[in-house]
């Protein structure tokens, strides 16, 4: 059977050997050039291919159309990937009529993504394994063909576990490759609700945070021990590496990072103590702990730190454009609750953020993004994370001011995105549930649902299309220029400070604010086209917690992801929303200050929004990506959100001229 192989590392070598032993004909092998900054302790796929007389290639981008065409000319019946480090495009996967299969170093669906060998040790797992699975467009998500479990011993380190996984992989392939060849395999779909995903690790990720428990730090040492770069710490400005360690249940009142003793070299942790068994200074030699202590000049009571003493101990700088808006002001509140963020904000007003103006870690400038371009560029360069939250996002404006929607939502934001590319800054961009348009899927999925909009003569879609286009531009910058990004799509977030009643008076507000204004003024609640359109309403606190976790980006799991943030359990029609709001209004303690309820009135969308409007019947999110990347679930019931939103707006009304 003819195959094309994508391979690297020891797993790549053993995978090739297993294919040849099983009688496969390998037409070509694709691999990588070695990274000079990486310690090459593993076998060379290129050398093995040359020794076996198999054509071998190492293109920078195997997914380029020219390479896709060359692979197509090889007419592979089946494709295999063994630790190839780049995603293989769907066009290549579809070339093999018998399918494509990947060897992954974990028990899928657990530990999808990068560096599973290291992550299982970091997380203190007692079991892992190897999985052969069918390749699909999404990484590590295809049906499982075979798995073998591997026990992780307490004394395993990265290299010993690597050898165990290689041994298991040989066994797995010996058992499974003949079955694939003869078309005799049983595939089991992965359970998405059990999936976890982890990002790539870099040497800088392995610093020892002494406030953590000793067991956690010991697991870090195990996970990156030689030949990996090693866990590290500092004495003053001098860096040293810890190659091996032991956990001591030492009860000490010493501050975390303090040296308890030098022989053995024992360091106080957040819980217990860590013995440094072996280590080395800088580019020196490996030595046992007490000698390392002597070399570093450590004595009892000395303090270690996770970064150089001279390093700037600064907070993560977050730039929020549109900081006075609904999301911006709530996000600012959440960030300032922590002690490691500095927030820089720009907006044309400050009423919603007045409570932060005297906060020492909040810096605000009043201005317009279309005018303050120099200020914005300077702060993009200065900050670590950029959130451009400025947009026109009220439906009536889509038909009333379509060109202004395009200019602000696309053109102004594109300039900010290009600043992020220029200065290599992380951007977290607010897409919208509107991009799904008239999609007919039961659940709108970030990776699979089609984005369907109406004809050009319906200007209502200019917001959706502007947002979709900028999503695609960001994605392209990520693919081609290495832009670090996350796109998030809010689904009908509600809560205090959503719009204001003055905006509702001119029709430029979200649905619930407009309904509250009707109740406050004693005017009929207008149900556009009967109010049967269904939406999934999400409490702002749930939404902000998800957004905060995107900013935190644990394990880089959010990089390059599109994440719906909504509550599929809080689905209701606009009519049902109005009824729930009315019930809450009638029992509110301030109810007697307001006029009698004037009833519901059905109106046509064209008379309310103007010519060129189309509505969407339903909009329910899949939150699979949010669960996978953020470990997040929405928790707050819709009635609680309605009650709190109504209460907030009623208490903003001047009651001095109202009858008591």
UniProtKB/Swiss-Prot annotation:
GO biological process, one term: lipid A biosynthetic process
Lineage: Bacteria, Pseudomonadati, Pseudomonadota, Gammaproteobacteria, Enterobacterales
Residues annotated for UDP-alpha-D-glucuronate binding in this entry: 393, 398, 432-433, 460, 492, 526-535, 613
Organism superkingdom: Bacteria
Statement: the UniProt record of this protein carries the keyword Lipid biosynthesis: yes
Family (UniProt): In the N-terminal section; belongs to the Fmt family. UDP-L-Ara4N formyltransferase subfamily.
Location of region: Dehydrogenase ArnADH: 314-660
GO cellular component: membrane
Renumbered residue ranges of the record's region Formyltransferase ArnAFT: 1-304
Binding annotation for NAD(+): 347, 368-369
Name of protein: Bifunctional polymyxin resistance protein ArnA
Sorted UniProt keywords: Antibiotic resistance, Lipid A biosynthesis, Lipid biosynthesis, Lipid metabolism, Lipopolysaccharide biosynthesis, Multifunctional enzyme, NAD, Oxidoreductase, Transferase
